[in-house]
Amino acid sequence: MKEGIHPKYEAVEVKCHCGNVIQTRSTKCADMQVEVCSACHPFYTGKQKLLDTAGRIDRFRKKYAKNNK
């Protein structure tokens, strides 16, 4: 490898909202935040979980509840 042409490959922490912290290496920014990781994702845990992004489900139900009455 040539000297000085490659980006730095440094250790970073990926922090999940569930509290899980994953150590990895990257050429990108420092620490990262994610909403879902392998410790809390329904596919990996086998548990059904509803992810509500900024109340979108409630707004949808409120909007279309008028039509059902």
Curated annotation (Swiss-Prot):
What is its cofactor?
Zn(2+)
A Gene Ontology molecular function term of the record: metal ion binding
Q: Which Pfam families match?
A: Ribosomal_L31
| Protein's GO biological process | translation
Cofactor detail note: Binds 1 zinc ion per subunit.
Can you tell me which residues bind Zn(2+)? Answer: C16, C18, C37, C40
Under Gene3D superfamilies, the record lists: Ribosomal protein L31
- A GO-annotated cellular component: ribonucleoprotein complex
Give UniProt keywords alphabetically. Metal-binding, Ribonucleoprotein, Ribosomal protein, RNA-binding, rRNA-binding, Zinc
State its role: Binds the 23S rRNA.
Annotated family: Belongs to the bacterial ribosomal protein bL31 family. Type A subfamily.
NCBIfam families, per database record: L31, PRK00019.1, PRK00528.1
Tell me how this protein assembles.
Part of the 50S ribosomal subunit.
**HAMAP family (alphabetical):** Ribosomal_bL31_1 (MF_00501)
What is this protein called in UniProt?
Large ribosomal subunit protein bL31
Which gene name does the record give? rpmE
